[in-house]
Amino acid sequence: MGINNPIPRSLKSETKKAAKVLRSFVKPNQVFGADQVIPPYVLKRAKGLAIITVLKAGFLFSGRAGSGVIVARLKDGTWSAPSAIAMAGAGAGGMVGVELTDFVFILNSEEAVRSFSEFGTITLGGNVSVSAGPLGRSAEAAASASTGGVSAVFAYSKSKGLFAGVSVEGSAILERREANRKFYGDNCTSKMILSGRVKVPPAADPLLRILESRAFNFTRHDHDDNASGDDFYDDGQYSDNTSHYYDDIPDSFDSTDESSTRPNTRSSRRRGMSLGSRSRYDDDYDDDGYGRGRGYGDFDSEDEDYDYGRSPNRNSSRNRGPQIDRGTKPRANTRWEDDLYDRDTEYSRPNHSGRDYDNTRGNRRGYGRERGYSLGHGPTHPSNMSNVDDLSHKMSKTGLGNESTATNSATPTAVALYNFAGEQPGDLAFKKGDVITILKKSDSQNDWWTGRTNGKEGIFPANYVRVS
């Protein structure tokens, strides 16, 4: 287990730290099997999550303090932007020493989320009940019971790589209002953030990739599709029978390999900002600089780039198919592992020649006719084509790409990396893992190809598949 920094830092750093911590709690590995991580049944029912790293120290009297983020699941199933939080508590006893612990708190009730949203604080064991979160086979029954009011919050903790029964009763989770104002704008509050009125920033991508994974959207159909037939936990062992449920959670967020790509999802397409938004998340000025007057009223519709220097335009990247995170080289001799989170991430600057998203209307369709892909970020949907034949005809006339028609002697195939439901007539819908016979393709995977699967033919985004 790496050392995570409990000292409050910028929301950008806290969000990346939270993604790393949450991944270690929800994705099995060779050490922790599927019955030793937070079960999908619990994650699916979660109304919110608080992810915190806490430092506990004491001599006669003990105290605990830490920092992290909180997110809420919205009514449409998407996730809110992260809100910065801190944790504080005190106790009495004979403890002598120091302990560093990562916590994931599962908020099972909307009341727990609402309590924090309204007042900016919740007291564990006070205004909300808390209990140790269930693991393994007892999880489904416990998660079902939680909806009946048994416990508003499930607590999971890990210290030095082991789950530990660390008591947190009496501890308070508090809003870090200054950090939120610094990041989002002068008048931003946790209520606005957790209600979905603030758009999700690019810095939250690693965290959203976990929140939108299969583990948080587990269904009984997924359980029934298990290779073992009916045993999801497989006697507590991590095996091929259960590992595929978690293969959409990356092992690292600094990788540029295939696992770091992420298709657009509901939260990544959500633009629901009823108040407008501060478009430049300036994460570099002083903590007390939030009173300088750049708030929600200063949204600039003509320039939506963030102040992260090399961060992408949100309208050009988060709404378009799989993206590649290009991490920078690690710094040497870092004392805290959290120092890694302050590094900028390399992105290619998107093409601003066209405005392909109407921010005032908040269009949420993944492949809408008004929002094609920008060059270099994925294929542009041929929105004016009524069927596949029209597509072939127009591509042959305009010479788009160097197409090659599949022959009977060597028909290429591809395996779907992501689900694609299709957005327009003529699209080829498929599920992750489906084998697609490629009928027509170009030399680039940032394009739309023609294929056949499950007895149907149509066009599909080539960067959603891996050519066999």
Curated annotation (Swiss-Prot):
Annotated positions of the Phosphoserine modification: 301, 311
Acidic residues: bias regions: 248-257
Residue stretches of biased makeup (Low complexity): 309-322
Keywords: Cytoplasm, Cytoskeleton, Phosphoprotein, SH3 domain
Domain SH3: 409-468
GO molecular function, one term: phosphatidylinositol binding
Gene3D superfamilies: SH3 Domains (2.30.30.40)
PROSITE patterns reported for this sequence: SH3
Pfam families: SH3_1, Ysc84
Region (Disordered): 220-386
Cellular localization per UniProt: Cytoplasm, Cytoskeleton, Actin patch
Induction data: Induced during sporulation.
GO CC annotation terms, alphabetical: actin cortical patch; cytosol
A Gene Ontology BP annotation from the UniProt entry: actin cytoskeleton organization
Composition skew (Basic and acidic residues), residue ranges: 334-372
Complex formation: Interacts with LAS17 and SLA1.
Function: Essential for the organization of the actin cytoskeleton, fluid phase endocytosis and vesicle trafficking, together with LSB5.
PANTHER family, sorted: SH3 DOMAIN-CONTAINING YSC84-LIKE PROTEIN 1 (PTHR15629:SF2), SH3YL1 PROTEIN (PTHR15629)
Protein family per UniProt: Belongs to the SH3YL1 family.
Name of the protein: Protein YSC84
Organism for this UniProt entry: Saccharomyces cerevisiae (strain ATCC 204508 / S288c) (Baker's yeast)
Encoding gene (name): YSC84
